[in-house]
């Protein structure tokens, strides 16, 4: 199998994973940056830590590293349009994306998206280069949770809502 064919098959296989849609934000001395639904996952709960992967060629990396902190905003099913803006699917500029309503400052001063299912603010503890991406290990310092809304995932290169079953009260 050719290397290019293997890469394409790998990408197609990864499109079968269904991660939650996240918007990663940072704002401090090095500037402001927003990264659309990047893969992130829990590493450990002691200390609470996650990993975030960003393409090594992204112009946002110096901003994330310079600020040393970020926020992972887990979008709810009603925030698909916002996810499309941040993914560059609508032609909206980066400055305009931050100009959208719904942002507030979190405990660490990071942009927290109102209505997100969860917002996890943390400090970047390590950055490693693995292939074409930088892997950020982030120690979580502040967590905001919402009891409202359903999930939003990205599966087979499309957004999909994930609805919770509701208990029926007799």
From Swiss-Prot:
Gene Ontology biological process: benzene-containing compound metabolic process; pyrimidine nucleobase catabolic process
Molecular function GO labels: flavin reductase (NADH) activity; FMN binding; NAD binding; oxidoreductase activity, acting on NAD(P)H; riboflavin reductase (NADPH) activity
Keywords per UniProt: Aromatic hydrocarbons catabolism, Flavoprotein, FMN, NAD, Oxidoreductase
The enzyme's E.C. designation: 1.5.1.36
Top-level EC class: oxidoreductase
The keyword NAD belongs to this UniProt entry's keyword annotation: yes
Transmembrane stretches, start-end: none
Annotated function: Catalyzes the reduction of free flavins (FMN, FAD and riboflavin) by NADH. Subsequently, the reduced flavins diffuse to the large HpaB component or to other electron acceptors such as cytochrome c and Fe(3+) ion.
Record-given protein name: 4-hydroxyphenylacetate 3-monooxygenase reductase component
UniProt source species: Klebsiella oxytoca
Lineage summary: Bacteria, Pseudomonadati, Pseudomonadota, Gammaproteobacteria, Enterobacterales
């Amino acid at each position: 199998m050719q290397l290019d064919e293997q890469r394409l098959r790998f990408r197609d296989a990864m499109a079968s994973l269904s991660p939650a849609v996240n918007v990663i934000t940072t704002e401090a001395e090095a500037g402001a940056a927003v990264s659309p639904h990047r893969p992130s996952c829990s590493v450990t709960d002691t200390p609470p830590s996650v990993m975030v992967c960003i393409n090594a060629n992204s112009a946002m990396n110096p901003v994330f590293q310079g600020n040393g902190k970020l926020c992972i905003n887990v979008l709810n099913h009603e925030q698909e349009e916002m996810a499309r803006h941040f993914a560059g699917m609508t032609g909206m500029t980066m400055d305009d994306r931050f100009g959208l309503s719904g942002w507030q400052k979190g405990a660490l001063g990071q942009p927290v998206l109102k209505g997100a299912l969860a917002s996890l603010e943390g400090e970047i503890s390590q950055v490693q280069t693995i292939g074409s991406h930088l892997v950020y290990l982030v120690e979580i310092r502040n967590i905001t949770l919402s009891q409202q809304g359903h999930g939003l995932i990205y599966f087979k290169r499309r957004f999909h809502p994930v609805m919770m079953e509701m208990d029926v009260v007799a």
